[in-house]
Amino acid sequence: MSIKYLIVLGIRPDIINYHPLVKELKKRKCDFIIVHTGQHYSYFFDGLFFKQLDFPHPDYHLKVGSGTQAQQLGKLVQKFEIVLRKEKPDLVFSFSDANTSLSGIVASKMGIKVAHLEAGMRSFDWRMPEEKNRRLMDSISDYLFTPTLSTEQNLLNEGIPPHRIFRVGKLIYDVLDHFKKEIDQNKILEKLQIERKDYFLVTAHRPENVEVRTPLKNILETLGVLYKKYGKKVIFPIHPRTRKSIKKFRLKIPSGIITMNPIGFLEFSKLEKNAFCCVTDSGTVQEDSCIFKVPCVTMRISTERSETVEVGSNIVAGLNKNHILEAVDRMVNKKPNWKNPYGKPQSAKKTIKILESRSNEILSPKVWWNHPKIEKNLSISEYQKSWKNKLLPDKTFN
């Protein structure tokens, strides 16, 4: 009897990072289904990526959409439970830290095994919604697949049992390695009439950066200074949220900045790989630039990709204009000779191999127990003894 896997995704990075996992599952002829929560959905943010990555069309689309945290999570929990009861998977994959990842909580409560990919990442900034999601998912997952030694250590420090932790590297490294030829052959540089290492690549989309006037104004002004100081164009694919805020706050885009709508995975990866420097608030760009050996400056006050700072590929500069400019100057004047902290591009292969080796554990009958009936005049010690006798051993949590 083989394991039935369920992959749940909801945002663009999920589609990209799940690619090697789906490829490995197909190669092994495993049984799997794909559920798209619809946390984010548009042609540019999903459809184009499905096409470029040759990603299977989801079996279910929950159409959760945007809204408040409570609205989004409420719809996710209700709709995802229906799919789980119908499909009865043996294991659910949950990726990283978006709200979609919390679908794993529903699976766990139903007695279904959960594997958390990109586990152990920590910004240690409790103000970030993603930090809460990461910690919640790591605490309830049965199998935690970490990308680096430091993420593994984070879990051990939090008391996660070692037998649930597996260091396998980064899925994005698998993706970039697989599509290396397609990325190199992409013609986005010619289309934009720019040369290799003669432009900055910028992304800004986080709500705290673009939904408040002052930080967004600072970012735009900083980009204008970069163009004047270095004489290099600034390529800025604008997230819909950012474009909406620029219009709302009536901000001007400085000269030298080339703006565009969101672009495909291959186009963006080609721009990343050949940039003079990446200036971003994106977690994925921090990883990509580290792998591509392109200097990166992060416009945030914290990062869960601490390994990029440790190896020297990235500086977390905050949102102060002078601090960002100083960080850029430091990064572009150093040799990109840092070590890749992500091992080899074999993360998906290792992940599935580990899970398949534990098929007996994953496929074992689900154990349920009923709370002991409370009798009148039962002492606390007698009640505790009765409760303990009702528990059946579960080797997974020993």
Per-range role (PLM):
Residues M1-K232, F236-I238, T242-N398:
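Nucleotide-activated sugar donor-binding and catalytic core shared by glycosyltransferases
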